[in-house]
Structure formats: C-alpha cells, structure tokens
Amino acid sequence: MTVLIHVLGSDIPHHNRTVLRFFNDALAATSEHAREFMVVGKDDGLSDSCPALSVQFFPGKKSLAEAVIAKAKANRQQRFFFHGQFNPTLWLALLSGGIKPSQFYWHIWGADLYELSSGLRYKLFYPLRRLAQKRVGCVFATRGDLSFFAKTHPKVRGELLYFPTRMDASLNTMANDRQREGKMTILVGNSGDRSNEHIAALRAVHQQFGDTVKVVVPMGYPPHNEAYIEEVRQAGLELFSEENLQVLSEKLEFDAYLTLLRQCALGYFIFARQQGIGTLCLLIQAGIPCVLNRENPFWQDMTEQHLPVLFTTDDLNEDIVREAQRQLASVDKNTIAFFSPNYLQGWQRALAIAAGEVA
C-alpha cells in the first residue's frame, strides 16, 4: 500500500509546528501513514525535533503545489491529507483533475472554509474553491464546521476531528479550588491577527461592562504587527483606563500563556467563524467560560460536550459570568472530546480513512 502523505501547504509556523510535533510524539510510532510530510516554510530545527517524521520543506506555496500535483499524476493510488488548505493552486488542481477526489482528504482549520476576505482576488477565487470542495474525498472538522460545510456540500463525506491542541491533561482539575472574586479580567481575542476584530470586541466588552473590568489583549503573534497593535491600543485607551487595559505585544511562551489565561474570568471572541480552538480549550480547561459570536459554529461542539456557552448578543454581567464559571467547574473535563488525549482516537480513525484502510 502507498503511504499517505501529509501536506501543510502554507507557511503558518505556529500551527505547522504544532501538527508536526503532535504526529512525531503521538502517531508516528504506531502508523506508517503518520510519517511523510510536505511543508511550506523553513526547517528551523523541526527535522531535528521530529526525528520520527520524514519532512520535505518547500520555499513557497507554488513549489509545494507543483510537487504534490506531480506526485498525484505519477501515481493515482497516492493519497494526500491536507491540513488546513490555504493553497489556491491545490484547489485548482482538484477542480481540474490534476488531483483526483480519491487522493484528496482535507482537515478544515476554520479560516480555510469561510469566505470572509473582501479583496477582489478572493471574491473571484471563492466560487472556484466552492466547486473544488465538492470533489474532496472526505473532510475532517469540528462538529460546527461539518454542519456549515454540509449546507453547501451535502454529498461530501464528513468526519469529526479536532486540531491537536497542546494540553496537559493533569491540569484538567486546576480551576476547581480557585477563588473567583474582585475585578474581573477578560481576555479579548486569541492572537494579534486582524480576524479577531479586536477593536469591535473591545467596544462590545465596554458596552457590556464599562470600565469596571480589566481587559487583556494577546497580540504577540503574528510577528511584524506593530502598526495594528498600536491601533488597537489607542482604540482601547479611548474606552478603558490605562490600568484596565493590557495589550501584549510580545509572544508568550506556553507556560507564560497558561499563567495569563488562569488570571482571566472570561474569554471574549467576536469573530464569526471557528478559530482559536487552542485558546478556547485552554480557557475551558482552566474553568474560564467563553463568549462566542452566534455565527461561530463551535458553540455546537461546546453544547454537545455539555459546556456553558455565552454569546456576544447576551446581556452579560458579573453574576452571569460567575454562574457560567460555576457550571463549568462541575463538568468532568476528562471527558471533553476536543481535549487531549481524547482527540487522539479521532486522529487514528482519520489516518485509517485517508489511507484507505477503512471504508
């Protein structure tokens, strides 16, 4: 049998590193279909830190796409597992027959599914991508994204799968004994990416709580974002006093990020699509409820796991937040499907499906 090849077709260092390390540490030892990767970006020590994997790096999307298409045409039994699909050339290859549906398996990351960019080239490309998506052999996604995808592509097979968020299962009970009183701290957004709509989110938080809460905005990723960070900071200072606004411009190490999250009473995410599942997982693990946009279908995954969900359209106050904290504290977090190690079973099944080992 031909070994499955995994494709990370865009240079997104943080996510790509997470996926590679997860496969190296959790999957490669037990499956030959978890070892071969084609990745856009620089090695930057990844080969050394992932010795169980065979990783081929490419300088750009186009060179990777050309290599994938060549492999697909040379051997029609060759299957590919695309992790997040932000590579237009690969979509066009699927649409034109360069890559066959039986060769194309796609794990949706969220941003690659929704049509939120307003630029002309995106608006011209989206209809073609939609046509190509009808030809995918199987999609893997959160419950909410599967539901969203099925509305336009009901005939494409869909399987539940969660991004492998880095988590320490021993921390699942860390929030149960915590004192929750005093001024609330609210986390706004999951990164410095503009998709977080930071300024609109800050205004929404201020409308709900006024200048009575402390707001923390993590913006250390992506890099080279200074102008937008300053724009968010100035907008925040028009709403909140200086002591109640903390805009973080430096990238935090994982343990420091966990410490930051544990100081929060609430996470506030205004974006209208599934994203930031890693931050959501870490907040929920710490017993911190989250406010979501009703258009973000991840609320379906949360309610399926019996987790409290607050919405941006709700009338929020401290009593409601504290009640959500109480409800979250009563949940057995060891049973949550999108937590580590529970998502591992979904990955093992996804590999078997994509490799053609199970129907």
Swiss-Prot record:
Record EC number: 2.4.1.325
Span of the signal peptide: none
Keywords assigned: Cell inner membrane, Cell membrane, Glycosyltransferase, Membrane, Transferase
UniProt enzyme class: transferase
Membrane topology, as annotated: Peripheral membrane protein
GO CC annotation terms, alphabetical: plasma membrane
Record's catalysed reaction(s): beta-D-ManNAcA-(1->4)-alpha-D-GlcNAc-di-trans,octa-cis-undecaprenyl diphosphate + dTDP-4-acetamido-4,6-dideoxy-alpha-D-galactose = alpha-D-FucNAc4-(1->4)-beta-D-ManNAcA-(1->4)-D-GlcNAc-undecaprenyl diphosphate + dTDP + H(+)
Pathway: Bacterial outer membrane biogenesis; enterobacterial common antigen biosynthesis
Stretches of the chain forming a coiled coil according to its record: none
Disulfide bonds: none
Pfam family, one: Glyco_transf_56
Gene Ontology BP terms: enterobacterial common antigen biosynthetic process; fucosylation
HAMAP family with a match to the protein in the record: WecF_RffT
Record's function text: Catalyzes the synthesis of Und-PP-GlcNAc-ManNAcA-Fuc4NAc (Lipid III), the third lipid-linked intermediate involved in ECA synthesis.
Record-stated family: Belongs to the glycosyltransferase 56 family.
The name this protein goes by in its record: TDP-N-acetylfucosamine:lipid II N-acetylfucosaminyltransferase
Species name: Escherichia coli O157:H7
